[in-house]
Amino acid sequence: NNSSPRLFQDDSSVYVYSEKELDNLTIGITDMMGNVYHYEVTTVPACTYYAVPIASLPAGTYYLSIYQGSNYVIGMFTVN
């Protein structure tokens, strides 16, 4: 469905995009070992690309998890 948040990545950030406002959204970045590199609770406005900075992360593969209540999206991305 179109209301699910979508994830995009460039060299400096991972972006959360949603067509509807997402309140009390928890965004976390962890590595494969479970170490937490980023954690925040925020609101993503409708039709906005919300940037989560990744430029300072060490090279490797990470999980980006997004939770809102019982709904969640987990994505994987790599930093070179």
Language-model-detected regions and their locations in the chain:
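Glycine-centered coil/turn sites that cap beta-strands in beta-rich domains
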Residues: 1-26
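Short, surface-exposed loop/turn motifs with a glycine/proline- and acidic-biased composition
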Residues: 43-68
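Non-cytosolic beta-sheet module surface loops
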Residues: 17-20, 31, 54-56, 68
